[in-house]
Design a protein with these regions (language model features):
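PLP-dependent enzyme catalytic core of the Aspartate aminotransferase-like
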Residues: 319-320, 331-359
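PLP-dependent aminotransferase-like
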Residues: 90-149
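Single conserved hydrophobic/aromatic residue that forms the stacking wall/gate
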Residues: 1-8, 12-13
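Glycine-rich phosphate-binding segment of PLP-dependent enzymes
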Residues: 19-51, 250
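Conserved PLP-binding catalytic core of the aspartate aminotransferase-like
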Residues: 272-273, 286-320
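Active-site phosphate-binding strand-loop segment of PLP-dependent enzymes
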Residues: 127-189
Length: 359
């Protein structure tokens, strides 16, 4: 009898645990999950596993071109933005780089490993972390070799408009500086055509745009990214080295499927736009937090109450199955900042209410 009741209580515990749905609002990924078109494309192309990859990836480049507006000839396909930056470091051998902080910077290590000096340009909290274009441009002296701009910013969710980017591109062009714009979150932006730096790549050979599929198409396990450049020397160099990061057949098939899945793309943008507005207005009436107006699919929040830290909020949310990100370890921020991404309406209600209970 005892064992029966133990089994019973164990079942109860398991039931109550399974009722707490895990909401990964810390990963900044599309809440719609992997597109069905991608799963289908992979299943349909299993026979391609025994076929060598095609260095040209023509179909995929055409799909990316139609999706992004980049010229097919300017698109280089690879596994991750990190790989592209590694190649750029080898290609440009930079001695001095500027990184904007706070900002998602996965490249410090690569630059340092290549003996590059890093100059951090801080955007002030008082200005809501917006980039002062005139001041930033004044720092772009001829001894700078490369600059990285995360747009929208991977930490603050702020966006730099295309006009400002063009100002920066002009100065970089005049001073022979490579300008790398990481558009990891650009797919989530409302008016991405008029905010993206892609049109600048055909005008300026020194402007390079990086994008990947991890966040918007929710496929971190796939590894597919692309670089856009019109620089003939860089393109030739990559050709000669035989594109060491050519992608496999299954990844190519998945890529073609996602970039042509107009329904998924439109639904994702609509959901994020709606939820971004709702979450922002639900939180904006509360005096105990400060918000930074988000352009991407996540929001940065500053906790104003002395007694509460980012860790406290994370710990409070976790037993409820809600995962949010403390920004204590991000350069330019401290333990008063949290960040979470927009999920589906039900999950966002829960996120907003739970965060407001503690802050």
């Amino acid at each position: 009898e005892m064992s029966a009741s133990l089994v019973g209580s164990e079942m109860c515990i398991r039931d109550s645990l399974s009722q707490v749905e895990t909401v990964r609002a810390d990963l900044n990924m599309n809440p719609l999950g992997v597109p069905e078109s991608v799963t289908k494309a992979i299943a349909d192309n299993m026979s391609q596993l025994s076929v060598y990859p095609d260095h040209n990836t023509k179909k995929l480049k055409e799909a990316i071109s139609a999706y992004s507006g980049a010229k097919t000839d300017d698109i280089i396909v690879g596994g991750s933005s990190y790989e592209f930056v590694k190649i750029l470091c080898e290609f440009t051998s930079p001695k001095k780089a500027i990184l904007i902080t706070p900002g998602a910077q996965n490249y410090e290590k690569l630059l340092s490993m290549n003996g590059c000096e890093i100059i951090y340009y801080s955007t002030p909290e008082e200005e809501d972390f917006t980039l002062d274009i005139a001041d930033f441009i004044s720092k772009l002296s001829e001894d700078i070799d490369i600059i990285f701009i995360s747009n929208p910013n991977g930490t603050t969710s702020q966006i730099i408009d295309a006009e400002s980017l063009e100002f920066i591109a002009k100065i970089c062009d005049g001073n022979n500086i490579t300008m790398v714009v990481d558009e990891e979150y650009m797919d989530f932006v409302d008016d991405l055509e008029s905010n993206s730096a892609i049109p600048l790549t055909s005008e300026y050979e020194n402007v390079i745009v990086l994008r990947n599929t991890t966040k918007f198409f929710a496929v971190p396990g796939l590894r597919l990214a692309y670089m856009i450049t019109s620089n003939p020397v860089l393109k030739k160099t990559l050709e000669i080295t035989g594109l060491p990061f050519a992608i496999g057949k299954l990844v190519e098939a998945a890529g073609v499927a996602m970039f042509t899945d107009e329904k998924y793309i439109a639904e994702s943008r609509e959901l994020i736009r709606t939820e971004r507005n709702l979450v922002y207005s639900a939180l904006s009436t509360h005096k105990s937090i400060k918000l930074y107006k988000p352009a991407a699919n996540f929001i940065l929040i500053r906790i104003l109450r002395d007694a509460i830290s980012a860790g406290d909020v994370v710990d409070y949310c976790m037993p409820k199955g809600l995962y949010i990100r403390s920004c204590a370890d991000i350069g330019g921020l401290d333990n008063k900042y949290i960040r979470f991404c927009f999920m589906n309406p039900k999950q966002d209600d829960l996120l907003v209410n739970t965060v407001l209970e503690i802050v």
